[in-house]
């Protein structure tokens, strides 16, 4: 044993890195050194396993996050509503750019909006899976009071069965809807007439044809040769108006959904674009809406 280790005396720095030796064992003609298994070893092994998988995983594991301050009080969101932790993204998937749209008033009647999710088919695979859809709704008027419902729709079902997933909230403050699902679509169904849709309805009373809110949405898609068809859930995340672009948790959440926008300046510019399309015509808003519209209603809270 002295001959084996005589020329390999560890330095002081190496001893700190290796930690205390526990035992020596001979296995298959070689000598193995065992040492205690620490939490750092477990984290390192997990990181290596994630890096070795197909695609890379972006993960926020900091627990609770500070979203900013309002007057003298800190706003702390629990881990259950940590945006960064919720929005784990497999970078092997295709992430769409943010689409900007408007919510326009309809007088004293409910305002309705239809968004068609028809992604570009840029693969030779047989199926495209929509795995996450994120919708941000931000009021652009003072003191909004309207209730809001957002539903994921299959327009090919009978009108009474078109709602696949639904979430509800208010536009008193900015609000985010995150649809988690596994919905595989064959290429022949990826048309404006047959693709999945988002239907939004708001009870805010506002002058007909005038915008009272901005809608921003994005999705992830994944191509494959085998289909999957599972509905999961819709998560509703209300956001306090105290959130600012300089909030670290908010910046990290935006990084995960918008990989091309990594600096605070870019994210501020992205958020500023929430209200940049106020000159969109009502004719374009109403264009292409078919007669087969899902019947939405507000649930009692």
Swiss-Prot record:
Residues 1-22, 282-301 are annotated as: Disordered. Keywords: Host cell junction, Host-virus interaction, Transport, Viral movement protein. Its main location: host cell. Residues 19-159, 209-283 are annotated as: Essential for tubule formation and cell-to-cell movement. Residues 284-288 are annotated as: Essential for long-distance movement. It is found in: Host cell junction, Host plasmodesma. InterPro entries: Bunya_NSM, MPV. It comes from the Viruses. One of its GO terms (cellular component) is host cell plasmodesma. GO terms for biological process: transport of virus in host, cell to cell. Pfam families: 3A. Belongs to the tospovirus movement protein family. Oligomerizes to form tubule structures through host plasmodesma. Interacts with host A.thaliana At4g26020 protein, which is involved in intra- and inter-cellular trafficking. Viral movemement protein which is responsible for cell-to cell spread of viral genome. Increases the size exclusion limit (SEL) of plasmodesmata by forming tubules structures, thereby allowing viral ribonucleocapsids to spread directly to neighboring cells. This is Movement protein.
């Amino acid at each position: 044993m002295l001959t084996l280790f005589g020329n390999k005396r560890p330095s002081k720095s190496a001893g700190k890195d290796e930690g205390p030796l526990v035992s020596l064992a001979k296995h298959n003609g070689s000598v193995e050194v065992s040492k205690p298994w620490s939490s750092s070893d477990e984290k390192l092994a997990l990181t290596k396993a994630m890096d070795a998988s197909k695609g890379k995983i972006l993960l926020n594991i900091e627990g609770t996050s500070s979203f900013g301050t309002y007057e003298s009080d800190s706003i702390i969101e629990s881990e259950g509503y940590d945006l960064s932790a919720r929005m784990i993204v497999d970078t092997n998937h295709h992430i769409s750019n943010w689409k900007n749209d408007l919510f326009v008033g309809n007088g004293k009647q409910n305002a309705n909006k239809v968004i068609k999710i028809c992604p570009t088919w840029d693969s030779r695979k047989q199926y495209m899976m929509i795995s996450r859809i994120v919708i941000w709704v931000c009021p652009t008027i003072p003191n909004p009071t309207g209730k809001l419902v957002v539903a994921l729709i299959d327009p090919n079902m009978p009108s009474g069965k078109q709602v696949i997933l639904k979430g509800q909230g208010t536009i008193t403050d900015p609000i985010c809807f995150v649809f988690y699902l596994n919905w595989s679509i064959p290429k022949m169904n990826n048309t404006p007439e047959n693709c999945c849709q988002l239907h939004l309805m708001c009870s805010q009373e506002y002058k007909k044809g005038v915008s009272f809110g901005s809608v921003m949405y994005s999705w992830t898609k994944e191509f494959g040769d085998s289909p999957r068809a599972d509905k999961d859930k819709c998560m509703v995340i209300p956001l306090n108006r105290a959130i600012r672009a300089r909030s670290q948790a908010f910046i990290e959440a935006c990084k995960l959904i918008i990989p091309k926008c990594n600096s605070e300046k870019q994210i501020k510019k992205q958020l500023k674009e929430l209200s940049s399309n106020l000159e969109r015509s009502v004719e374009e808003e109403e264009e292409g809406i078919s007669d087969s519209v899902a019947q939405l209603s507000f649930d009692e809270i």
